């Protein structure tokens, strides 16, 4: 029995030592959210030397922080349940996997945990002041503002903006992940995240009709799926708590996908989501000279391109799949018809490679009008990227349940990849599509010169 008690004592001591050695993000109970919490900001440092074991740091104790390297601050937002952000560990590890840097998790869970949103939002400037004091000390030790990068989620995006404002916009970069909308919509630039808060500000808007901010806030603002309902998220309250937070959190998971090598999400500068869906805004992907902006960590590769704009701001749109890694692969389908009468309808296109892999895109955001000898360019999105397309199938539908079945006579169809403009363009001539009947054919290389 004595041996058992000694074992339990040693186990408790080892757990206590582990907790002291490796501090973790503050975990609070739902009771804390009910009664509210006072503000306490903790800074936890991760580097490649301590990837899984954080160091608590402050203005007088830097730990492993190397001021000559980039320092990325991760600032979370409102925490109505008191639990740690489920994505935090993945974000820390993802950042350190792509670059040798300092990653500082800004834990203000004591302050953000409350059922009353206004209580949390009222503390954002105080959090920003704590961060400024720490960065001031970093600068005194030889750090450069050029190397300061802040990633702010929801309320954390505005906190990052407040920090940047206190340095007159000389922070290297701020990324806002679905910046909070409530209490910030319509506010003047000094009371929210703004393009002038850093040398480069990129923003992902994923929940503009609820918890997020709709209007542009950065040098480049990304709107996945138009910034509204995200694929794979619950559409009704029957989805439980995910119904409220899934769209809002999607911005974080989209950013995470940019840290992985599985695929790269490309966006298309455009005035509106509808124009993008109609294929009017994909010129950046038609040549290797003018690349499209990339979502997430590598978005700043487009910084020099934006400097040529006045003002240096743009909106970019793209569609995603329902699950990680969320990538969609874009193609232009150019169709010239020779029907005597005008036809209106939808086109469904399938691609198949030599291995038998298939991928499908139904281009049905709005019916397309086909006129004789007029070229129509359709933007098709696929879940898979098939390198060598061996077969293509097309199906035309007017959507009518009654009346005659029409034919769509195609003089020429051309398929070109936007993700890989260097790939050969594929063509087919003299096709007749019977309504609601799938027509399969083998494409040939287009004789035209490549763009």
UniProtKB/Swiss-Prot annotation:
Sugar-bearing residue positions: 50, 66, 357
Taxonomic lineage of the native organism: Eukaryota, Metazoa, Chordata, Craniata, Vertebrata
Name of this chain's protein: Lipase member H
A Pfam entry, by short name: Lipase
Assigned protein family: Belongs to the AB hydrolase superfamily. Lipase family.
Any Gene Ontology biological process: lipid catabolic process
Superkingdom of the organism of origin: Eukaryota
UniProt key word Transcription: no
Top class in the EC scheme: hydrolase
Reaction catalysed by this enzyme: 1-hexadecanoyl-2-(9Z-octadecenoyl)-sn-glycero-3-phosphate + H2O = 2-(9Z-octadecenoyl)-sn-glycero-3-phosphate + hexadecanoate + H(+)
InterPro entries: AB_hydrolase_fold (IPR029058), Lipase (IPR013818), Lipase_LIPH (IPR016272), Lipase_N (IPR033906), TAG_lipase (IPR000734)
Residue positions of the active site: 154, 178, 248
Residues in coiled coil: none
GO molecular function: carboxylic ester hydrolase activity; heparin binding; phospholipase activity
SUPFAM superfamilies: alpha/beta-Hydrolases (SSF53474)
Regulation of its function: Inhibited by sodium vanadate.
Record GO cellular component, one term: extracellular space
Signal peptide: 1-18
EC identifiers of the protein: 3.1.1.-
Keywords for this protein: Cell membrane, Disease variant, Disulfide bond, Glycoprotein, Heparin-binding, Hydrolase, Hypotrichosis, Lipid degradation, Lipid metabolism, Membrane, Secreted, Signal
The organism of origin for this protein: Homo sapiens
């Amino acid at each position: 029995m004595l041996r058992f008690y000694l074992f339990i004592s040693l186990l408790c001591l080892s757990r206590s030592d582990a907790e002291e050695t490796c501090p973790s993000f503050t975990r609070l109970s739902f009771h804390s959210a009910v009664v509210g919490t006072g503000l306490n900001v903790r800074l936890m440092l991760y580097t490649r030397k301590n990837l899984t074991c954080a160091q608590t740091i402050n203005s007088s104790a830097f730990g492993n922080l190397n001021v000559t390297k980039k320092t990325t601050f991760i600032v979370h937002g409102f925490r109505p349940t008191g639990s740690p952000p489920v994505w935090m560990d993945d974000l820390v590890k993802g950042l350190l996997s792509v670059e040798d840097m300092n990653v500082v998790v800004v834990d203000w869970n004591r302050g953000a945990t409350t059922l009353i949103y206004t209580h949390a939002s009222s503390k954002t400037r105080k959090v920003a002041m704590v961060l400024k004091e720490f960065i001031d000390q970093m600068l005194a030790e030889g750090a450069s503002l050029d190397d300061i990068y802040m990633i702010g989620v929801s309320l954390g995006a505005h906190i990052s903006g407040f920090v940047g404002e206190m340095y007159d916009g000389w922070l290297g970069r701020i990324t806002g992940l679905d910046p909070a909308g409530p209490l910030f919509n319509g506010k003047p630039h000094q009371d929210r995240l703004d393009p002038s808060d850093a040398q480069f500000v990129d923003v992902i808007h994923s929940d503009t009709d609820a918890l997020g901010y709709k209007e542009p806030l950065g040098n480049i603002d990304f709107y996945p799926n138009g910034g509204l309902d995200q694929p794979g998220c619950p559409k009704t309250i029957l989805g439980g708590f995910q119904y409220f937070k899934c769209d809002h959190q999607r911005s974080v998971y989209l950013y995470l996908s940019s840290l992985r090598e599985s695929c790269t999400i490309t966006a298309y500068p455009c005035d509106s989501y509808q124009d993008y869906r109609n294929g009017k805004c994909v010129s950046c992907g038609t040549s290797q000279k003018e690349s499209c902006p990339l979502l997430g960590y590598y978005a700043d590769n487009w910084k020099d391109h934006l400097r040529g704009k006045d003002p240096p701001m743009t909106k970019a749109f793209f569609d995603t799949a329902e699950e990680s890694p969320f990538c969609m692969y874009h193609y232009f389908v150019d169709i010239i018809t020779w029907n005597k009468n005008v036809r209106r309808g939808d086109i469904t296109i399938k691609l198949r490679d030599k291995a038998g892999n298939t991928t499908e895109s139904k281009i049905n955001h709005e019916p397309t009008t086909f006129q004789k000898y007029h070229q129509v360019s359709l933007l098709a999105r696929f879940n898979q990227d098939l390198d060598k397309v061996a077969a293509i199938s097309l199906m035309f539908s007017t959507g009518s349940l009654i009346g005659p079945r029409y034919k769509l006579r195609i003089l020429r169809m051309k398929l070109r990849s936007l993700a890989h403009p260097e790939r050969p363009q594929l063509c087919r001539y003299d096709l007749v599509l019977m309504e609601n009947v799938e027509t399969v054919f083998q494409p040939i290389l287009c004789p035209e010169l490549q763009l």
